[in-house]
Amino acid sequence: MKLNPAMWRKALQIIPHVSKEEWQALDILSRWLIATRAAVLIMTFLSAVLAGIFAFRAGLFDFWAWLLVALGLVLAHATNNLLNDYTDFVRGVDKDNYYRAQYGPQPLVHGLLTKRGLLTYAAVTGAAALLTGLALVLMKGPMVLLLLAAGAFFVLFYTWPLKYIALGEIAVLVVWGPLMIGGGYYTITGAWDWNVVLASLPYALGVTGVIFGKHIDKFEMDKERRIHTLPVVLGEKLSRGIVVGMFVLQYLLTFYLVAVGFYTPVMAGVILAFPSLYRILPLFRLPKPAEKPAGFPDVWPNYFVAAGFYHNRSFGIVFILLLIVDTVLKLVAG
């Protein structure tokens, strides 16, 4: 079986649709990247990058600890995606052309993997994540074990029951901000910093907005299946407004951290990402259309989630580039 670097790149950029015949011809890494929805793992990797930059900014960067943090977080997220697909399949959620099976291959629904095969992927990936976590415990001390336990809790219980009882979106905010970035910073440096936790929220709000958008996109489907995501509980219209509010709050929190002196004034440059938010605002004024709009990118049925991802990518790139400049200025100034 030949290695397929072209598919590796594709699977890291989008969630590719593949037939059963195409799947059988793929190498094991390509299959793993598709099954774990590797294109979305970039959000987790960027959280690890931010934790590393904050550690470097504080003069406490440890490359090997950061590398294990990044690897462990990505593997944990991949494990969660696999368990998500398994849980939804055995609970009957993904049948009847459910949203998840429309935007990319669901390994069980599309017959790419057996239940045993998917659980094997999850077990191996989860074991690798656990091993990196245990290595960090040995390197950095027992307090890291608490962060490892918290991460394991969310990996195992996000899909059920948290997502079903309107706690999934809150879990995402906690995980991608305080836990991944704040906890990652602590694991790398050995010091807890509440300013770093606060500084993690602009990025975490973007990720949460993307998840919120996905849950609005499948509002009717989740409502029928009694999956009580926050949009189902709060209503579709209010949820659209909350997503926009979260995106605006990303900028306001960054400006606040500039005002109190945690950041240098260069971080106010995140306003350069605002045109991407302005561009998607019209989409959030009305409910999701029944059919794909003319000229809409080829990501349907992703609609609000696609808009959120577009803004989050723009904000994230600008935020990280400015944070690097901010870090250099901070270190030069002493």
Residue ranges and their predicted role:
Residues G104-W192:
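Intramembrane alpha-helical segments
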Residues V49-L50, A58-Y86, L145-L156, D193-G213:
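Membrane-embedded alpha-helical segments that form the functional core of polytopic membrane enzymes
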Residues V172-R225, R240:
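Functional transmembrane core segments of multi-pass inner-membrane proteins
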Residues M1-W64, L68, I165-G168:
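Topogenic membrane-insertion module of multi-pass membrane proteins
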Residues A259-V332:
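Extended hydrophobic alpha-helices typical of membrane-associated regions
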Residues I42, L46-L50, A171-Y185, Y203, ...:
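Small-residue-rich segments of transmembrane alpha-helices in multi-pass membrane proteins
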Residues L75-R100, T208-P231, E236-L238:
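Acidic (Asp/Glu-rich) catalytic motifs at the cytosolic membrane interface
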Residues N97-L138, I227-P265, A306-V318:
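Multi-pass membrane catalytic core of lipid/isoprenoid biosynthesis enzymes
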